[in-house]
């Protein structure tokens, strides 16, 4: 378990651009940059120790759409840990991304539909697999958040506790992109019950959220932030220094 969470900037890719959605709605997007590689460079310059990439088109279409952009970012920052989700539905895609230089691959919808696939991926790519759990009111959502299932997020997390998953990215859909604050209770509860390190996502707005999450460094490995750093309500460098205790 990680004692000091890292701030992880999100770079969400849609139609070749860096965007942010509200509550996962593809039609409700804000374009922040036409150059995702330049945006990645900005966050690295500001002190990012890890990047979170999402192929939004891939998540909805079920196949990778932004391979070239992802490869370009990985090539530009070969020593930086990079995690990616969206459109990962088979072993070939995982292999291609890891070969391209990505550190972690996030399996979301496929993890719900075929848990055995996660176990197989962990065997083939040990230490590189993250499960992405997106939830609304504690219930798992799939296919780019289009479908809400009857599976509890905590129950899904427990399924992967012993198969070699590196961590879980937990996103509270209701708060994602809404700047309403992170759901600390559900995030910590998932980590405690699931038995895996969790990367918090959805709702991070300002330093107050970072302060609320810091005490749970024993189970929260990272904090993904998107709109807050893009709109300036959270300073990436300041937040990381605070978590570092400096």
From Swiss-Prot:
Record-annotated active site: 12 (proton acceptor), 134 (proton donor)
Pfam families linked: His_biosynth
Gene: hisA
Pathway: Amino-acid biosynthesis; L-histidine biosynthesis; L-histidine from 5-phospho-alpha-D-ribose 1-diphosphate: step 4/9
Keywords carried by this UniProt record: Amino-acid biosynthesis, Cytoplasm, Histidine biosynthesis, Isomerase
GO CC annotation, single: cytoplasm
Keyword Isomerase belongs to the record: yes
Stated name of the protein: 1-(5-phosphoribosyl)-5-[(5-phosphoribosylamino)methylideneamino] imidazole-4-carboxamide isomerase
Signal sequence interval, chain numbering: none
Organism: Psychrobacter cryohalolentis (strain ATCC BAA-1226 / DSM 17306 / VKM B-2378 / K5)
Entry's EC annotation: 5.3.1.16
GO BP of this protein: L-histidine biosynthetic process; L-tryptophan biosynthetic process
GO MF annotation terms: 1-(5-phosphoribosyl)-5-[(5-phosphoribosylamino)methylideneamino]imidazole-4-carboxamide isomerase activity
